[in-house]
Amino acid sequence: MQARDVILRPIITESSMAGADRKVYQFEVNRKATKTDVKVAVADVFGVTVKKVNIANVRGKNKRMGRYQGLTRNRKKATVSLTADSKDIEVFKNQEENK
């Protein structure tokens, strides 16, 4: 799997932005990706050193539209911790400046 196929998008929430100060970032990743895949992809794409990767499978929520019901899609969320000497990831830094 290519590095660009592993990381789908960054997760930008209040809690993820609070973690960015401690060099902890969250990404939505491919559902077939492993911790090792995520570690290699983040290191390649952003040029940083990864300390630890935690992964959580997030189930889709039940949604209704009138009498029709369905589910949002399932996703996989990766929390990536960087080493202290790594540089910050620019995607999250730009979001902090816009607030």
UniProtKB/Swiss-Prot annotation:
Annotated GO molecular function terms are: rRNA binding; structural constituent of ribosome
The function of this protein is: One of the early assembly proteins it binds 23S rRNA. One of the proteins that surrounds the polypeptide exit tunnel on the outside of the ribosome. Forms the main docking site for trigger factor binding to the ribosome.
Top-level taxon in the UniProt lineage: Bacteria
What keywords would UniProt list here? Ribonucleoprotein, Ribosomal protein, RNA-binding, rRNA-binding
InterPro entries in the record: Nucleotide-bd_a/b_plait_sf, Ribosomal_uL23-like, Ribosomal_uL23/eL15/eS24_sf
Q: What is the lineage of its organism?
A: Bacteria, Bacillati, Bacillota, Bacilli, Lactobacillales
Query: What organism does the record attribute this protein to?
Result: Oenococcus oeni (strain ATCC BAA-331 / PSU-1)
* BP terms from Gene Ontology: translation
User: Which residue ranges run through the membrane?
Assistant: none
Q: Which SUPFAM superfamilies match?
A: Ribosomal proteins S24e, L23 and L15e
Name the record gives this protein = Large ribosomal subunit protein uL23
**So what family is this one in?**
Belongs to the universal ribosomal protein uL23 family.
Q: How does it assemble?
A: Part of the 50S ribosomal subunit. Contacts protein L29, and trigger factor when it is bound to the ribosome.
Provide one Gene Ontology cellular component: ribonucleoprotein complex
Gene that this sequence comes from: rplW
Record-linked Pfam families:
Ribosomal_L23 (PF00276)
